[in-house]
A protein has these predicted regions:
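Beta-sandwich/jelly-roll carbohydrate-recognition scaffolds of carbohydrate-active enzymes
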Residues: 1-168
């Protein structure tokens, strides 16, 4: 029927926009020493490994096949020297969206713990349609949540820490 056809493909909100700073120095991709990337289609994972500014970073982006429209980034950091690493996440919103709202909330989990969730919403099609994206950090050993948008890792030489960032 009329109106059921796809008229165009709309770019969505990207909930995983990680940036990194080592000892207060924002990461610059041009400073990356040998980089290795691989894609494992069977496990739905894209892996990147690089070294920069005294740390080695391995991150894996996974499609969560049992959860449509969800993905996860797993990050492992190993220190080549004593270092403090700050990761921040910012949602990327396409320019054609209107009424963009960004907010953070703390939500309760079944086990009684609480997690901070970053949420971004916007409208398109002259306000008739809406889209929402959300993300949250899941800290592993050696990782500390600073805010809903940031985590900090403080490592001694040879130390290792990890976290995951889940988004939908």
């Amino acid at each position: 029927g009329f109106g059921d056809d796809v008229s165009r493909i709309l770019e969505g909100i990207n909930p995983l926009g990680l940036t990194m700073a080592v000892d207060g120095h924002r990461f610059d991709p041009s400073e990356v020493r040998p980089q290795h990337q691989s894609v494992d289609m069977r496990r739905a994972v894209h892996t990147t490994r690089f070294s920069t500014d005294g740390v080695t970073v391995v991150y894996r982006i996974r499609a969560l096949r049992n959860m449509p429209y969800a993905l996860m980034t797993e990050v492992e950091v190993t220190a080549e020297r004593d270092a403090e690493v700050l990761f921040s996440n910012g949602h990327t919103v396409p320019g054609e969206f209107a009424d963009t709202l960004r907010e953070s909330r703390t939500v309760g989990c079944e086990d009684g713990s609480r997690i901070a969730v970053q949420r971004t919403s916007g409208s398109y099609n002259r306000g008739r349609d809406h889209i929402v994206a959300s993300s949250t950090f899941l800290c592993g050993e050696g990782c500390e949540a600073v805010s809903p948008e940031s985590v900090r890792i403080v490592l001694r030489k040879g130390g290792r820490a990890s976290f995951s960032l889940v988004g939908t």
